[in-house]
Amino acid sequence: MSGTILITGATSGFGQATAQRFVKEGWKVIGTGRRAERLEALSAELGSAFHGVAFDITDEEATKKALAGLPDGFRDIDILVNNAGLALGTAPAPQVPLKDWQTMVDTNITGLLNVTHHLLPTLIERKGIVINLSSVAAHYPYLGGNVYGGTKAFLRQFSLGLRSDLHGKGVRVTSIEPGMCETEFTLVRTGGNQEASDNLYKGVNPITADDIANTIHWVASQPKHININSLELMPVNQSFAGFQVYRES
């Protein structure tokens, strides 16, 4: 199986690894992101099978313009991977700047909706696949996860609702929900604190970007009569935390 796939957030982590995997498998890949220089480097690495488009998915007009301007040979999109997303900060809710919450909502939710809404007609026409990158944070709350977890819960529910709305049209929708993954994600979350990022994953043997790329490829490779509704995965060394209990004195 091969075709054309669009991956948001292709400048690093899951998105970059997924672009590399799908080009290797013979697909045409459209990679989006805000860092044009990284898209140019990826294009130099992957060749003519990769087309990079630099724009901000939170900007509705920029999204429309960028996607409407895709060149011939890259317009018939079979798979949309909504990967772009971020978490900012690890502090409890009362200590988080409102701007950080707004940025997470804008990127993780609004940006995803902008891209998905624009591409739905093509995906319906081609009986395509929508793959949304959610998180185990959609299910399991943790300290400092407040708005980030809320945005990922939205992605999971949106995936289920979209699948319901598109029932009978042959479009498949999947929510992939990873646990601890070692990418730039934590470096961004900690404001560039490399030591804090390294310590988080020390001794964990976390999920890698290649693991997620392989998972996305597996989902996309299923027979057309099978829909993977959701797929939750964790490293073996990660499990479930106990409930917090506050004891009054």
Swiss-Prot record:
SUPFAM superfamilies linked: NAD(P)-binding Rossmann-fold domains
One Pfam short name: adh_short
Comment on pH dependence: Optimum pH is 9.1.
EC number assigned by the record: 1.1.1.276
Zinc-finger is among the record's keywords: no
Enzyme active site: Y148
Description of how the protein assembles with itself and partners: Homotetramer.
Positions contributing to substrate binding: S135
EC class (word): oxidoreductase
GO molecular function, one term: serine 3-dehydrogenase activity
UniProtKB keywords: NADP, Oxidoreductase
Catalytic activity: L-serine + NADP(+) = aminoacetaldehyde + CO2 + NADPH
Signal peptide positions on this chain: none
Protein's job: Catalyzes the oxidation of the hydroxyl group of serine to form 2-aminomalonate semialdehyde which is spontaneously converted into 2-aminoacetaldehyde and CO(2). Also acts on D-serine, L-glycerate, D-glycerate and 2-methyl-DL-serine. Does not act on O-methyl-DL-serine and L-threonine.
Protein name: Serine 3-dehydrogenase
Keyword NADP among record annotations: yes
